């Protein structure tokens, strides 16, 4: 391979790897926005997802002992998605049921995500900046010289799938209806509150997935502030 080809390949790989978490977070945010709930808590959810994935995998490695455990990173991914969905549910609950200001609720989550990881890291690792490195990170798929995390492929495959769900399915029609014309949707029998809960929780699940990619796919540990504003960029 020539020097120019090697450079272009490395540039393309780097671009795809950096794009994946932004894409997952942006797709998640779109579900929330389409349902009529502003979710600027994506940055905080991204950090909570990354922290959860790294800590869960590292703690399980410590409990199970040395040796390859190829299924462990997928447990971390599921845990990150669950925590992301849970944090988003809290935002939805406060915003929808208790009618709190959506911006204030989301800002509170972002502020919590600035401090909570330090407490968790200090408790488990004795420092407030990073977790231990995990031995079982997400695998790489693809031909030699062009290998990517499976979550990169997932991120790009979700683009057409999300379009299809939002614009070609009854679920997508209802979700868009409650965001654009909630009164009209309600008169047609659509449960506006339930659809909004679903939209916000989906945004949290996808953003948690992006966080898992950052800590056990792109890197192999959690580092405080590793999202570097990606949640806000994705908005």
What are these regions (language model features)?
Residues 12-15, 23, 44, 48, ...:
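Hydrophobic alpha-helical transmembrane segments
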Residues 66-114, 157-160:
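Alpha-helical transmembrane segments within multi-pass membrane transporters and channels
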Residues 146-222:
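Helix-loop-helix "hairpin" substructures at the membrane interface of multi-pass membrane proteins
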Residues 89, 111-124, 150, 161, ...:
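Mid-bilayer segments of alpha-helical transmembrane spans in multi-pass integral membrane proteins
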Residues 19-28, 44-49, 86-89, 208-210, ...:
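Hydrophobic alpha-helical segments embedded in the membrane of multi-pass proteins
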Residues 33-49, 96-109, 198, 219-233:
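Short, non-helical or kinked segments that cap or interrupt transmembrane helices
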Residues 114-144:
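Extracellular/periplasmic helix-loop junction at the C-terminal end of a transmembrane helix
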Residues 1-25, 38, 52, 60-75:
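Membrane-interfacial amphipathic/re-entrant helices at transmembrane-helix boundaries
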């Amino acid at each position: 391979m020539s020097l120019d080809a090697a450079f272009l390949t490395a540039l393309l790989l780097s671009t795809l790897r950096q794009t994946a978490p932004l894409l997952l977070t942006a797709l998640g945010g779109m579900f929330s926005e389409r349902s009529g709930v502003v979710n600027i808590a994506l940055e905080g959810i991204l950090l909570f997802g990354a922290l959860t994935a790294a800590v869960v995998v590292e703690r399980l490695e410590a409990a199970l002992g040395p040796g390859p455990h190829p299924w462990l990173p997928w447990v971390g991914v599921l845990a990150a998605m669950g925590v992301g969905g849970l944090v988003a549910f809290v935002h939805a609950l406060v915003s929808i049921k208790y009618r709190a200001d959506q911006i204030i609720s989301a800002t509170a989550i972002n502020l919590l995500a600035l401090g909570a990881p330090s407490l968790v890291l200090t408790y488990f690792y004795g420092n407030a900046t990073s977790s231990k490195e995990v031995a079982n990170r997400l695998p790489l798929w693809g031909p030699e010289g062009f290998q990517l995390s499976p979550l990169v492929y997932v991120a790009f495959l979700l683009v057409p799938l999300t379009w299809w769900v939002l614009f070609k399915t009854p679920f997508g029609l209802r979700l868009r209806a409650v965001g654009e014309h909630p009164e009209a949707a309600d008169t047609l029998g659509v449960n506006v509150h339930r659809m909004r809960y679903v939209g916000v929780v989906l945004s949290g699940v996808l953003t948690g997935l992006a966080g898992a990619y950052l800590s056990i796919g792109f890197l192999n540990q959690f580092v405080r502030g590793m999202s570097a504003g990606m949640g806000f960029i994705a908005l």
